[in-house]
Design a protein with these regions (language model features):
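Globin-like tetrapyrrole-binding proteins
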Residues: 1-13, 186-188, 198-202
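Short, Gly/Pro- and small/polar-rich lid/capping loops
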Residues: 8-69
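Active-site- and interface-proximal helix/loop "cap" or "latch" segments in soluble metabolic
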Residues: 47-49, 61-204
Length: 204
C-alpha cells in the first residue's frame, strides 16, 4: 500500500502561513509520527445572496480511500473513485427559515443510497437556530435518511449565519448605515457561544 501524495495538506508556498497573531504564534501542528494516509474526507460549503434577496447555502462532501477495496454493489473501488459524494442546497430567508431544500447522492456505497434524497425537503419550514441538530435529525435522520447528508447540515448552518449576517453588515457598511447598536446587537446574539464572545472577553 502506498500513500497517495494528494492527501498531503495544501499549504501555500511560504515559510509561515499568514496569521494576525504575531510572528511568535504557532501556525503548524506538532511533528507527526511515521504514518500512512488511509482516508480523506473533503467538505466544501458556500453561501450565496440571491437576486431575490434569499440566500442559497450549498455543500459538497466526498470520501476517498487510499487503497482498492471490494464492493458488492460497485465492484472494485479504487482511490480515484469517491466512496461517498453528496451535494445539497438549502434556500433561506432573512429569518433563517428554509424555503427550499434539495440533495443529490452522486456516489454511495449501496444501490439504495439515493433513496435518502427524497426526505430532504422535510427541512422546508425549519428555522436554523437553537436545537438545529435535533430538528435536522428528526426531519431527515434515521432509517429513511443518509448519515453523511445529515452531518453536512451542521456546517451548513454555520455558513448560513456567516453568509446572512456578513452580507447584511456589508450592505450597511456600504450604505453608511452600520451603527454601534448594530454591532452590539450582533454580539449579543452570540454571547458566550465561544471564547471570543464570552462575557468576560477582552475583545470589543
Amino acid at each position: 500500500m502506498t500513500t497517495d501524495p494528494s492527501f498531503a495538506p495544501k499549504i501555500p508556498a511560504m515559510e509561515t502561513p499568514p496569521t494576525p497573531y504575531g510572528a511568535a504564534h504557532v501556525t503548524s501542528l506538532s511533528p507527526a509520527v511515521p504514518r500512512e494516509a488511509v482516508h480523506k474526507r473533503q467538505i466544501n460549503c458556500n453561501g450565496f445572496v440571491r437576486a431575490d434577496g434569499l440566500y442559497d447555502i450549498e455543500a459538497e462532501l466526498t470520501d476517498h480511500k487510499t487503497y482498492d477495496f471490494p464492493s458488492d454493489f460497485r465492484g472494485t473501488v479504487t482511490p480515484d473513485l469517491a466512496v461517498h459524494h453528496m451535494v445539497l442546497r438549502i434556500t433561506i430567508n432573512r429569518d433563517r427559515v428554509i424555503q427550499h431544500a434539495e440533495a443529490i447522492t452522486i456516489t454511495g456505497p449501496y444501490a439504495i443510497c439515493p433513496k435518502a434524497n427524497a426526505v430532504f425537503d422535510n427541512l422546508v419550514g425549519l428555522q436554523i437556530g437553537p436545537g438545529w441538530r435535533r430538528k435536522v435529525q428528526a426531519a431527515i435522520g434515521g432509517r429513511h435518511g443518509c448519515t453523511h447528508i445529515t452531518e453536512l447540515l451542521g456546517p451548513v448552518a454555520t455558513i448560513a449565519y456567516q453568509a446572512l449576517y456578513g452580507e447584511e453588515a456589508r450592505q450597511k457598511r456600504q450604505s453608511g448605515t452600520l451603527t454601534n447598536q448594530d454591532k452590539q446587537a450582533s454580539r449579543s446574539q452570540l454571547a458566550n457561544s465561544c471564547v471570543g464572545y464570552a462575557d468576560d472577553s477582552s475583545d470589543p
